[in-house]
Amino acid sequence: MNVLVACEESQEVCKAFRAKGHNAFSCDLLDCSVGHLEWHIIGDALKILSPELRQDNTRSIWFVTSDGTFHSLPRWDLIIAHPPCTYLTITGNRWFNVDKYGERAIERIKERELAAEFFMQFVYADCDKIAIENPIGYISTYYRKPDCIVNPYQFGDPHKKATCLWLKNLPPLQPTNIVEPEVVYYKNGKSDSPWHMNTMHLPKEERSRLRSKTFPGIAKAMADQCGGEA
């Protein structure tokens, strides 16, 4: 299958599909952090979602990967998208209180609407099979409830990170290896996952990049259950 993994610089999902023999490409505004330049597209994923009319009256999706290679495909058979969640996740809800945060909250509300509209571009993409990932948050109200919610600890990685999946013509992701999640406790009694806590001291951009990365177990399950052997 021709697979587009949109909004992914880590290439975790892309690599999993490549391992199954699929023609998968990651796409992000950032360079890939792994190094498979031949599989990575730098740019706006929305610009390569659908085939465009060429001068010879044929339709195709064309792009250049980071290694400088030109590609032309008839269409995507599967799109897996990871739209930015900064303004969509439930963990940021407190910042939308206009009475408390005023203009700052108003600006965040505008950004949230733009983020939701970006998310919906993948929902309406011209592709037979689609999976869109985001944390628990605004999309469940703006669009609809997800088809399934999974955690890394259900796929062999001992971490909690509730991940929602909205699916089109794909089965809900089934757990493959349930393990005990690692948990740390703060003095106030609240708990957290070590992977999340360990990123708090990092610069904003680096923290966001690491927190958005798909864990290997979920990536492999996506490739196995949504793609299978090519």
Descriptions of predicted regions:
Residues 1-230:
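Conserved active-site and SAM-binding loop architecture
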